[in-house]
Amino acid sequence: MGLFVSFEGPEGSGKTTQVRLLASWLSELGWRVLTTREPGGTRIGDAVREVLLDPAHTEMRPETEILLFSAARAQLVAQVLVPHLDAGGVVVCDRFADSTFAYQGYGRRLDLDILRAITAFATGGLVPDLTLCLDLPVVEGLGRKQGGDQGEWNRMEREQIEFHERARRGFLSLAAAEPARWLVLDATQPVEELQAVIRRRVLACLDNKM
């Protein structure tokens, strides 16, 4: 079994940059690295992503949202993640099931026990070996997004500040409940400093796998 690393955190925390840097470094070390994101990562998942994040879908119910996220996740796990991990590779994923607990659980206030049951069904019990939470104040993260070049904000990014604050608190609560799996990092640090800490932790996880 390979190593499964997920990145979590509020919007604008720099996850995508850190995913790219980590994957490139691991590849240079000789590891077979797969990078992916949620929702998406498969043809079906990417189609679901378009529906989920379309700003025009303002009428989407929280229950619809969680089932769509879980459908995309089930496809990603079965089609992409499990085969790569079974072959001994490293998966670096930009968001995974913990985002469901933070955004749909804490953010939308859906029942966490129901979300856990749906998630277990969708993932077959697959859990990351290491989850890196890039944390920063919500206003700062959204400010980064606004000042970036990523184009129009998606449906989730357009939610009220209070929603994003609840989601952030959710990430921190999840991390506190599983300190062995989670590492919370200050995402206001320089990119290079963050990456150095991430690499040290990932190397330790790889050593434990051997």
List each model region and its residues:
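Pre-Walker A (Motif I) flank of P-loop NTPase domains
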Residues: 1-4
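Walker A (P-loop) phosphate-binding loop of P-loop NTPases
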Residues: 12
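Hydrophobic positions on the alpha1 helix immediately C-terminal to the Walker A/P-loop
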Residues: 18
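ATP-dependent small-molecule kinase phosphotransfer cores
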Residues: 31-123, 197
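A glycine- and Lys/Arg-enriched "phosphate-lid" helix/loop adjacent to the NTP-binding pocket
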Residues: 100-169
